[in-house]
A protein has these predicted regions:
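Glycine/small-residue-rich phosphate/adenosyl-binding loop
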Residues: 289
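Short, solvent-exposed loop/turn positions at domain surfaces
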Residues: 16-17, 55, 121, 160, ...
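DNA target-recognition patches
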Residues: 4-9, 16-52, 192-249
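A short beta-sheet element
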Residues: 31-32, 49-111, 222-285, 294-307
């Protein structure tokens, strides 16, 4: 059987952003960013109006339908927890009558499926509806599907619990930050301060075209974190990098050793005798730089958008004390993250055994 035999494949749409009334409704409209680490989706960052639905003819995704990203980021999968809508980068897999196929089984099947003919690039990959329709699929009895789902749910449950531990540690670090420094947006403890433009100089990295990309050992950082591994690097040592472009632009992290920084991210230069790296990273994330992004279809932050942002400057000794406490938390996070990798490897092995 092919996917075309089993599924009534459908894509979503994006209403015109030039008509503000299209974006003032309460209908859930899912983009790839809304699918991050969520098996069931019932909400979205953006919503659309009934007027937009009528004007575009966008089809509703019924509750229980499985859907998957197939452009830019292939293979993010979720199940609709309520009736909703999606954009055109997401394929929907309504099951045709006559096929006993569990949505939960299909969820794992799509996560584990190796897509033929996917055009994988440095910063993303693409499929199309024709390629998806031509893929072959087979599945066992509904009872065997449930047994497989139960096993894989057990492993994903372990991963979810460990991710919850990571979130708790993040909350602890954030609590320590507020305890020591107050609210940096209001400078509630009246620390000395200066403007962003007087503290930081931002410089974007270097473009990395698909034809120049060679898989290697060095992480490639783009607007949303690591996007791949290259055989060359353009940065070494300790750096603060800030995502410049994309749904998660404004994310801040400390990166050490050798890596490639693309032009979708900034390297933040500053005087390390005035600001500690880990304090500065935590401060900038607490200030939520994403709120200063423009509102184009592809969000972007810039030097000009951040230049007047207030940056608190506590004594460097206090900053370093905070960093020592945070580094201890980061070590705990690293141990948990490594255990998550182990469980994910086991999950991947089991999915390969069932779906390859």
């Amino acid at each position: 059987m092919t996917f075309a035999d089993v599924f009534d494949l459908q894509m979503g749409k994006t209403p015109s952003r030039d008509i503000s009334s299209y974006w003032s409704g309460d209908n859930v409209w899912v983009s790839i960013a809304d699918m991050k680490d969520r098996k069931y989706v019932d909400s979205s960052k953006e919503t659309i109006s009934d007027e937009a639905i009528k004007a575009t003819g966008i089809r509703e995704v019924p509750e229980g339908t499985v859907f998957m990203s197939f452009k830019l980021s292939i293979g993010k999968v979720a199940i609709a927890a309520k009736n909703l809508y999606t954009n055109e980068a997401i394929m929907q897999f309504p099951i045709k009558p006559g096929y006993e196929l569990s949505p939960e089984y299909l969820y794992y099947y799509l996560l584990g499926h190796k897509w033929q003919g996917a055009n994988k690039a440095v910063m993303g990959a693409t499929l199309n509806k024709k390629k998806i329709a031509q893929e072959h699929i087979s599945f066992p009895s509904i009872e065997e599907q449930q047994r497989i789902v139960d096993e894989l749910d057990l492993l994903t449950g372990i991963i979810d619990k460990k991710n919850a531990q990571l979130r708790d540690l993040d909350a602890l670090a954030q609590s320590i930050f507020y305890e020591m420094f107050g609210d940096p947006n209001a400078n509630s403890l009246n620390w000395p301060s200066s403007s962003f433009k007087d503290i930081f100089k931002l410089k974007s990295g270097d473009g990395l075209k698909e034809k120049d990309f060679v898989t290697g050992q060095f992480p490639v950082y783009g607007g949303n974190g690591i996007s791949g591994y290259h055989n060359a690097f353009n940065k070494e040592g300790k750096h603060i990098i800030i995502g410049r472009v994309g749904a998660y632009c404004g994310n801040v992290r400390v990166v050490e050793d050798c890596f490639w920084l693309t032009d979708n991210a900034f390297d933040a230069f500053f005087d390390s005798s005035v600001l500690d790296y880990y304090f500065a990273s935590w401060l900038l994330n607490t200030l939520v730089l994403h709120r200063f992004a423009n509102h184009a279809a592809q969000p972007v932050i810039s030097n000009s958008g951040l230049k007047d942002l207030l940056i608190i400057l506590p004594p460097i000794e206090i900053q370093r004390h905070f960093s020592e406490r945070v580094l201890a938390i980061l070590q705990q996070k690293s141990s948990i993250s490594n255990s998550i990798i182990d469980v994910k490897m086991l999950l991947s092995e089991r999915m390969d055994a069932y779906f390859s």
